[in-house]
Amino acid sequence: MKHLHRFFSSDASGGIILIIAAILAMIMANSGATSGWYHDFLETPVQLRVGSLEINKNMLLWINDALMAVFFLLVGLEVKRELMQGSLASLLQAAFPVIAAIGGMIVPALLYLAFNYADPITREGWAIPAATDIAFALGVLALLGSRVPLVLKIFLMALAIIDDLGAIIIIALFYTNDLSMASLGVAAVAIAVLAVLNLCGVRRTGVYILVGVVLWTAVLKSGVHATLAGVIVGFFIPLKEKHGRSPAKRLEHVLHPWVAYLILPLFAFANAGVSLQGVTLDGLTSILPLGIIAGLLIGKPLGISLFCWLALRLKLAHLPEGTTYQQIMVVGILCGIGFTMSIFIASLAFGSVDPELINWAKLGILVGSISSAVIGYSWLRVRLRPSV
């Protein structure tokens, strides 16, 4: 019991559980004895009906769209705190992750196109390496525990949120044909209500969550990635303290253990089970996986580092207080963990053309993401080594 308490008291415990869940999923998905059970679990239908409103999704989509919205709510709360009171409080500091995210999307896409531009079919996957899987990137960072400065974690969060927003916009513009404008209208009204609640000084968290559920449902029905609703709600919940209490900080404290020890491991278990059936190492030499690997492993850190360097040289932004440029470069490597968002974009790009291309894309995504995770973790472990 003592060892268990010590483990859960460690800052690295959440990251360790997430990695174990991901490894377990990979083993189960590729084992003849367990792959059927694993996929049956993910395909289990779960239906929610309130009056004429019906949401009918399988277990995988409920985890990715509903539970992960709670994770993004926590991320939104933490980033807002840093924007208002912490390391991103000045305009020039807040601009830094925005510029970094732009570079982290443009350069990987260009590098992918350098490999695939001549092929009109594989060229459609240009956005695959532009994405970052924020959950796995933070999970790898969490493995380093308390040696990671909080400001570095917040920078990664802010960068990855903007990266995700960029990916959502790319999906909506280039890979989605059936956006529901009526649902987007309902979402806009819900956001307006959240803004009014905030301006009127309403401090009851439950009211924001209730409107947030309406917002989440509208975003889900619109065809846009529903987790966006979590970030939006997080940004509107009041941070300012009154009588020594802050609704945002209180909710952040409540959500943290649920996210670290339940939601993120469940997300990893549901999404890391990529079947490698039909995938061979010989395929690594083809232009599709090579373009993805180059985009994630080289393009991400190169784009983030280059755009950050230009921003500093041109005085368009300042480094977040307490960080170094070298640390930002390593965070850029961790942003090469594209994983679930990259796989999602690959399925949209190639699903209706040639499903076999999705397998080759998965191979590139796995190699690029795992390499980025190992290199980023190892480099940070050396650079953030505690002084003896």
Swiss-Prot record:
Topology relative to the membrane: Multi-pass membrane protein
Transmembrane segments: 12-31, 59-80, 97-116, 123-130, 155-176, 181-200, 205-222, 224-236, 254-272, 287-310, 340-350, 358-380
Domain of life from the UniProt record: Bacteria
Reactions it catalyzes: Na(+)(in) + 2 H(+)(out) = Na(+)(out) + 2 H(+)(in)
Topology feature Periplasmic, residues: 32-58, 117-122, 177-180, 223, 273-286, 351-357
Molecular functions (GO terms): sodium:proton antiporter activity
Keyword terms of this UniProt record: Antiport, Cell inner membrane, Cell membrane, Ion transport, Membrane, Sodium, Sodium transport, Transmembrane, Transmembrane helix, Transport
UniProt record, GO biological process: regulation of pH
Matches recorded under InterPro entries: Na/H_antiporter_dom_sf, NhaA
GO cellular component, one term: plasma membrane
Cytoplasmic compartment residues: 1-11, 81-96, 131-154, 201-204, 237-253, 311-339, 381-388
Cell location: Cell inner membrane
NCBIfam families: NhaA, PRK09560.1, PRK09561.1
Biological role stated in the UniProt entry: Na(+)/H(+) antiporter that extrudes sodium in exchange for external protons.
Similarity field: Belongs to the NhaA Na(+)/H(+) (TC 2.A.33) antiporter family.
Protein name: Na(+)/H(+) antiporter NhaA
Species the sequence originates in: Shigella flexneri serotype 5b (strain 8401)
